[in-house]
């Protein structure tokens, strides 16, 4: 029904928004460590991010079931399987590797000597990030956020495995309609949902770039 489709779109948008926000925060921190730090285990972290991108969503979803469906987790209030929380966690985890690789590529173009020079002039860590790294990484950051947002909305593998009862998402609604031979509903949901998501992504790009240009103008 139309109500189920709207509900699925709302849930998917919520998951995608959370994934993009938390994904960019965590992905930025990981990318900074991989690019500029002397952390001894950064090669291991780099390898893990690459492996996470290569693992199929179905495998990740099954892994989340095994991890978060343990009896002892109920006693400590962390039994997330069968709740929307596990979808949030899985969506964020799926978005981080992609965001991280895009930011690593952007940071590779920014020499560490810029940050070192700023530090020698008395700039603190957060000031270096705010005045040097973030402005130069603007395009990469916007691309990473939009890619994570769009990818999370249509993440069929994870959502079909982990979605709780009475909690539909757009990919689940499309898949269920197709399996029930309701091809018209599936096609309509794909077109309407896709157009809606593309519109939101275009609006986000305009807003993020407009804010950056306004700041640069001052």
Task: Kindly give the residue locations of the regions a language model identified.
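Membrane-interfacial helix termini and adjacent extracytoplasmic/periplasmic loops
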Residues: 3-6, 37, 41-44, 58-92, ...
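Periplasmic/extracellular loop-to-transmembrane helix junction in inner-membrane transport proteins
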Residues: 1-21, 180-181
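Hydrophobic positions within alpha-helical transmembrane segments of bacterial inner-membrane proteins
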Residues: 20-28, 32, 58, 62, ...
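Interhelical loop and adjacent transmembrane-helix boundary motif
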Residues: 1-4, 153, 159-205
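Internal alpha-helical transmembrane segments of multi-pass membrane proteins, especially GPCRs
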Residues: 10-18, 47, 85-88, 129-134, ...
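Residue-level recognition of pore/gate-forming positions within transmembrane alpha-helices
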Residues: 50, 66, 91, 151, ...
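C-terminal transmembrane helix and the adjacent membrane-cytosol boundary/short C-terminal tail
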Residues: 33-34, 41, 104-115, 119, ...
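Transmembrane alpha-helices
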Residues: 51, 55, 93, 100-103, ...
């Amino acid at each position: 029904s139309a109500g189920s489709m709207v509900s699925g779109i709302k849930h998917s948008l919520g998951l995608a928004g959370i994934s993009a926000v938390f994904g960019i925060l965590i992905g930025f921190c990981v990318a900074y460590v991989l690019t500029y730090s002397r952390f001894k285990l950064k090669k291991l972290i780099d390898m893990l991010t690459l492996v996470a991108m290569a693992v199929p969503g179905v495998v990740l979803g099954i892994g989340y079931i095994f991890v978060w469906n343990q009896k002892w987790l109920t006693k400590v209030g962390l039994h997330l399987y069968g709740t929307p929380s596990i979808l949030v966690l899985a969506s964020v985890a799926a978005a981080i590797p992609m965001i991280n690789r895009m930011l690593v590529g952007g940071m590779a173009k920014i020499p560490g000597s810029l940050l070192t020079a700023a530090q020698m002039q008395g700039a603190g860590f957060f000031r270096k990030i705010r005045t040097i790294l973030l402005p130069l990484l603007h395009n990469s950051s916007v691309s990473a956020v939009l890619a994570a947002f769009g990818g999370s909305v249509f993440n069929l593998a994870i959502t079909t495995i982990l979605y709780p009862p009475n909690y539909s998402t757009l990919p689940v609604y499309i898949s269920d309609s197709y399996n029930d031979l309701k091809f018209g509903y599936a096609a309509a949901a794909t077109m309407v949902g896709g157009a809606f998501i593309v519109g939101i992504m275009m609006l986000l790009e305009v807003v993020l770039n407009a804010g950056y240009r306004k700041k640069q103008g001052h």
